[in-house]
């Protein structure tokens, strides 16, 4: 009682997932008193891309938020503001690859050779976390492992 097993259901895959979710929702409604959250936002906003704005809109944005005028990744033209947005959003980026997947910073022709140190500085400041804790892509992929002449 109190456990709903939706794993291992023989189905055609993802196409039946919405129907299974509705079925589980109906079961939970019978077991618990549920009420709709009036503040629930069902969609998330994307990361603001200044390069998609008109010149006037971009200038206004930079005037209000100067970090959007600071280019971090020259190859992909990604700004500090975009990286900060990727870090501070729900389930925000916590690694270089996390920032890369959300913003494209590091996907250009230099493959993060120029922007990775600057992206790491932003992660260190905004998360906040130590340079030693910043990874390329999760546990075991630390980039900084010691100080110069110590390693």
Predicted regions and their residues:
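C-terminal catalytic lobe of FAD-dependent flavoproteins
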Residues: 1-71, 78-91, 96, 104-107
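Short, surface-exposed acidic
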Residues: 36, 96, 129-136
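Iron-sulfur (Fe-S) cluster-binding segments and ferredoxin-like electron-carrier domains
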Residues: 79-90, 113-131
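Short Fe-S-cluster ligation motifs
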Residues: 100-116, 133-151
